[in-house]
């Protein structure tokens, strides 16, 4: 193993190598300032051509289909070599001098730049992050009705950003009448670049920062901007917990039972368009209802903030599984197609407004 390098020295990297025994690498993910146990990891292996290695974590952080694998940290596939919830194996071909592995199919800055290049979108700046980076803001369209879209309130939640990309691509070819998209694709921008968990940061994360005195520049800027706009609809794209149960599904998190009829109407449209899209499947019956499970938490969130705006017809988070199931399996293509279906469903929904 002397000539093999295993590291996280790249944008989005997150791993600690504990030890190496023969062809087995023992690993641990880094929580950093996350206060609770969380699962994201991402690392690179260089110089392992022709070798077969086993990677073993200290906790059960390997998904159903093994690791997400990429040669360029942009195009991903599943390794399909899971040994157990702790470990997976990988056989490096002789032309694989550098391979990236991750908990899930990461949506990186490279993916975002490819989207900008292919669509010609020119982003604005929402604000400067705590670390001095320009946080991207996208505006598309010129209609009076504003649709506010966000993702990566929690830095590690990549599936939601793929879904958001699909929404953007669909909107560009079939815009919703009299609307404008206002998009913050990576709210925790520093966290995305640094490879942080982002969830449950100390003292609290970006999605718990919708208070009268926000501590993060991004949430403060979103609040200020949204209050100036005629926001009629808001979607916050997320990924749920690691796996099992509802975490293997696509679901809407409903905050208010008073809007049940509106959620049902949109959900029925989304279920139909997802079924026709060759994307991740969504079923209305899987929605997380108000005051159930972790949705009983009354801490202010992006959705509670947008719901408080007098102009806002409906606001919710859309959660998309990291892995899915064998019959509803995550891939970058299916995530993007899910996003296209969300846009089509919303276009149909707006016809009744």
Where are these regions (language model features)?
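Active-site/substrate-binding loop(s) of hydrolase catalytic cores
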Residues: 123-138, 144-303, 307-324
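His/Asp/Glu-rich mid-to-C-terminal helical/loop segments that flank catalytic regions of hydrolases
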Residues: 325-353
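Extended acidic/polar, glycine-enriched regions
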Residues: 83-131, 141-142
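Extreme N-terminal flexible tails
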Residues: 1-95, 99
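A short, polar/proline- and glycine-enriched secondary-structure boundary/capping micro-motif
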Residues: 63-69, 110-114, 160
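Intrinsically disordered, low-complexity acidic/polar segments
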Residues: 64, 110-111, 192, 244, ...
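Short, Φ-rich (hydrophobic/aromatic) sequence segments
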Residues: 41-43, 270, 342, 346
